[in-house]
Regions:
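Acyl-CoA thioester-binding alpha/beta core of soluble enzymes
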Residues: 1-245
């Protein structure tokens, strides 16, 4: 059994990147939703995007070696990779969890506001946390932030924080989002675009690589989540990546 929607999502990603549709026959999906506790179909999202990257790698491998292969992606394994920060170990240690704040001091997350609306605060970075606390005039306790937001509407809190460049957002229904100017703008945009930013001679790659992207060198200047994940994915398939954060 597999999720038909994963095939549909992959097809959209693959064709949007102007890749040959015939290659999609090399992909196999296994597993069904739900894979993670969510109102969103995170398993389908994980499965289709990972398959797109893996298929691209397989196509490059075939162009360099002449060897074709089938790409198989299990929905549970794909979903686990979307929570990889919980499983990654560096020299045997999970360094991402060594300096976590105590729950009562962690103000990142979702809050109910005075109008029964909700807001999400992004406060994982120390400077964001400091500025949010200063703007709301709260101490470092989550309870203090919660009490303050109960005196404000979700929209008021959003405006107060975003007007000075802080990452926070009112949680909206599908209908509310579709009426929002940003919702209108996003609806008119493709999921992604590929823009050529300069001309250069094609890199000559060897025909006997050990990995699909062997010989590719990448300088990664991104910072949060999606950006570094791109660099990590390239490295997984054999590219040399330097991440400057």
């Amino acid at each position: 059994m597999h999720e038909p929607q994963s095939n549909e999502a992959l097809e959209k990603l693959w064709t949007l990147a102007q890749n040959p549709p015939a290659s999609l026959n090399k992909v196999r999906f296994t597993g069904m939703e739900p894979s993670l506790p969510s109102i969103y179909k995170t398993g389908i999202l994980a499965q289709s995007t990972i398959a797109a990257a893996a298929l691209a790698s397989a196509e490059i491998w075939q162009s360099r070696t002449g060897l074709s292969q089938t790409v198989t992606v299990d929905i549970d394994a794909a979903s686990a990779s979307f929570r990889s920060e919980n499983y990654l170990r560096v020299n045997g240690n999970n360094r991402f969890h060594t300096n976590k704040l105590k729950p009562e001091n962690n103000i990142h997350g979702f809050y109910k506001c005075g109008d029964d609306g909700w807001i999400q605060l992004h406060a994982n970075y120390p400077q964001h946390r400091k500025d949010i606390l200063q703007t709301l005039r709260c101490d470092g306790l989550r309870k203090s932030v919660s009490n303050k937001l109960l005196t404000m509407s979700a929209l008021e809190a959003e405006n107060k924080l975003t007007n000075i460049g802080l990452p926070a957002g009112k949680m909206r229904t599908v209908e509310e989002w579709s009426e929002h100017p940003q919702g209108h703008a996003v609806a008119r945009m493709p999921l992604f675009t590929i823009t050529k930013i300069g001309d250069a001679a094609p890199i000559k790659l060897s025909q006997n690589p050990k990995r699909p992207l062997e010989g590719i060198k990448t300088l990664d200047l991104t910072k949060v989540i999606a950006g570094p994940l791109i660099g990590r994915t390239l490295a997984e398939h054999g590219a040399d990546v330097i991440w400057v954060n």
